[in-house]
Design a protein with these regions (language model features):
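Internal, hydrophobic beta-strand segments that form the core of beta-sheet-rich folds
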Residues: 112, 116, 160-175
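A short, structured loop/turn motif at beta-sheet edges
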Residues: 104, 118-120, 157-162, 187
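Secretory targeting and sorting signals
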Residues: 1-18
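N-terminal "mature-chain" segments and other terminal, solvent-exposed stretches
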Residues: 16-128
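Short beta-strand elements
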Residues: 178-187
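Short loop/turn segments at connectors of secondary-structure elements within structured domains
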Residues: 12, 107-109, 160-162, 179
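Extracellular carbohydrate recognition and processing domains
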Residues: 126-155
């Protein structure tokens, strides 16, 4: 799979106080925060706090704990819920605008986007074996701080079908951590 590198489109809005999550496609943590998904535990109040070790896929959260960034407080994000997470409709091979919302901005190494392999059913917690471990989109950020809203345009890989998860990883430059967001999609 070819590695995409994108230029970032910036849209600034006001800032609050914590970290960040994706809302396009909508992430599991945002679905919990806006009340679409119930029984989410602490993540419903802290969608911006899914922070774990950086270095994915060689390091970072353990298999089965990826969507929660390895953070046990947010383990509901790793719960497959029988494959019933709401999905965003996407088209394989088409351009898509991925969007992050930040409540605290950090010096950033890059943003990386991964997707599950065809045949993934969503009935078990996400593992590296479920993912194409080569990101389909990488957006270098050269130690800059993003604005409070940031969009990246990239192409969703061709040949994808069925259900999938897009894993977005925001790698922080000046700490050992990254932020993780899982978005359930349907082709």
């Amino acid at each position: 799979m070819a590695l995409g590198v994108a230029a970032a489109s910036l849209f600034a809005t006001s800032s609050a106080s914590s970290h960040g999550y994706t809302d396009s496609p909508i992430s599991r943590q945002k679905l919990c925060a806006n009340g679409t998904v119930k029984n989410c535990g602490d993540i419903q109040w802290e969608p911006q706090s899914v922070e774990g070790l950086k270095g994915f896929p060689a390091a970072g959260p353990a298999d089965g704990r990826i969507c929660a960034g390895g953070n046990s407080r947010f383990s509901q994000l790793d719960d497959p819920r029988g494959g019933a997470w709401p999905t965003t409709k996407v088209t394989a091979g088409q351009s898509y605008t991925f969007r992050w919302q930040f409540t605290a901005r950090h010096a950033t190494t890059d943003f990386r986007y991964y997707i599950t392999k065809n045949g993934w059913t969503g009935t078990k917690a996400l593992t590296r074996a479920d993912l194409d471990t080569q990101p389909f989109l990488v957006v270098p950020y050269n130690n800059q701080q993003p604005p409070s809203t940031l969009s990246h345009s990239g192409t969703i890989p061709a040949g994808k079908s069925g259900k999938a998860v897009i894993l977005a990883v925001w790698t922080i430059a000046d700490t050992g951590n990254a932020f993780y967001a899982c978005s359930d999609v349907q082709f």
